[in-house]
């Protein structure tokens, strides 16, 4: 831990916590810090100008990152008949109905995303206490309850990320890996910011995107000048 501490201390000394860095410089600093022995994720935290306690200001949605996430995902789909075949053809690892529900109840959750056709919600609805706490419960707001299960599977495989504001009014998301080129990370961040803008609640007043900060898994936060994002 001593080496890690010294590394982080050295990096932290390079970062001015009060400064807003242009996106290219911010990405350079974050990638420089990502020197662990694994391919660290590059994460973003966005402080929103909303009241997360108000139900009409809960920001939630999904976006397909143009450069992907760098992570392989296993997809489970609740579907039957033709839609089940479409889900399999699109690349879903697990497809079923009551049999899949029994698998979930048995604790066999070897998948990262769950998608459901609307006509299967009578089955999926009984699994809320299991899937909900794990962030796996299908929801139409993020595109995981849909009649077009094939497209949903393809989006999940292509690098779709879901986002939901926390109690502090902050969105947390992963926009790639340290091994990504800066241009790929920048395009992913822009896609996320665009999606957040589109998801802005009508009742939100004042500045909506208040703060944007980047970090790697084992790194420190670097604040981003939002004007540099708009200039891309």
Curated annotation (Swiss-Prot):
<keyword id="KW-0689">Ribosomal protein</keyword>
<comment type="subunit">
    <text>Part of the 50S ribosomal subunit.</text>
</comment>
<dbReference type="InterPro" id="IPR002143">
    <property type="entry name" value="Ribosomal_uL1"/>
</dbReference>
<comment type="function">
    <text>Protein L1 is also a translational repressor protein, it controls the translation of the L11 operon by binding to its mRNA.</text>
</comment>
<comment type="similarity">
    <text>Belongs to the universal ribosomal protein uL1 family.</text>
</comment>
<dbReference type="InterPro" id="IPR023674">
    <property type="entry name" value="Ribosomal_uL1-like"/>
</dbReference>
<comment type="function">
    <text>Binds directly to 23S rRNA. The L1 stalk is quite mobile in the ribosome, and is involved in E site tRNA release.</text>
</comment>
<keyword id="KW-0810">Translation regulation</keyword>
<dbReference type="InterPro" id="IPR005878">
    <property type="entry name" value="Ribosom_uL1_bac-type"/>
</dbReference>
<dbReference type="InterPro" id="IPR023673">
    <property type="entry name" value="Ribosomal_uL1_CS"/>
</dbReference>
<dbReference type="GO" id="GO:0000049">
    <property type="term" value="F:tRNA binding"/>
</dbReference>
<dbReference type="InterPro" id="IPR028364">
    <property type="entry name" value="Ribosomal_uL1/biogenesis"/>
</dbReference>
<keyword id="KW-0699">rRNA-binding</keyword>
<keyword id="KW-0820">tRNA-binding</keyword>
<dbReference type="GO" id="GO:0019843">
    <property type="term" value="F:rRNA binding"/>
</dbReference>
<dbReference type="InterPro" id="IPR016095">
    <property type="entry name" value="Ribosomal_uL1_3-a/b-sand"/>
</dbReference>
<keyword id="KW-0687">Ribonucleoprotein</keyword>
<dbReference type="GO" id="GO:0003735">
    <property type="term" value="F:structural constituent of ribosome"/>
</dbReference>
<protein>
    <recommendedName>
        <fullName>Large ribosomal subunit protein uL1</fullName>
    </recommendedName>
</protein>
<keyword id="KW-0694">RNA-binding</keyword>
<dbReference type="GO" id="GO:0022625">
    <property type="term" value="C:cytosolic large ribosomal subunit"/>
</dbReference>
<dbReference type="GO" id="GO:0006417">
    <property type="term" value="P:regulation of translation"/>
</dbReference>
<dbReference type="GO" id="GO:0006412">
    <property type="term" value="P:translation"/>
</dbReference>
<dbReference type="Pfam" id="PF00687">
    <property type="entry name" value="Ribosomal_L1"/>
</dbReference>
<keyword id="KW-0678">Repressor</keyword>
